[in-house]
Amino acid sequence: MKNYKLDPDEFLNFVHDIDLSKLKKNSVLFKKINNLPGSKIIYTNGEKNYAEKVLKSLGVSNLFKSIWDIKKSKFIPKPEMSPLKNLLSTNKIDNSSCVYFEDIEKNLRPAHQLGITTVHITDKNPTIKKSYVDFRFKTIISALDMINKNF
């Protein structure tokens, strides 16, 4: 946005103009997230209002303590380290007891470097195992099952 002199709010409104009508409330997802210990925070390169709409569509919005969006990150996107460090310190999070779920593999690197357990959600079968990916699952449900059983 900075390099192209775009208004951040205008850009975010444009990229988040997405039809969410295909997203449905998911009682299984609600139960699995609700069973996770500790506080839950959404960390997104998107904007808070968009994240809230997605969470509401899935029926899980009341399960999250907060949303740390691109604006709270001072428009510094993942996978940069500084916004993640700021999120962790502001929320007084113990890195060693934290689990970071992500669908973009490279975004896991900073979390892993900080001692956070990393979980990559992807339907692809990567041929190369990355050292900064602790676990890989095809669905968020299977990842939540493992975390709820083992952490």
Segments the model singles out, each with a brief description of its role:
Residues 3-16, 64-68:
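Short, basic/glycine-rich phosphate-binding loops at helix/coil junctions
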Residues 4-5, 28, 59, 148:
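Glycine-centered secondary-structure boundary/capping sites
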Residues 6, 38, 116:
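Short phosphate-binding/catalytic loops that engage adenosine nucleotides
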Residues 9, 13-42, 48-52, 78-81:
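Short, acidic loop-to-helix structural element flanking the phosphoryl-transfer center
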Residues 20, 34, 47-151:
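Asp-based, Mg2+/Mn2+-dependent phosphohydrolase catalytic module
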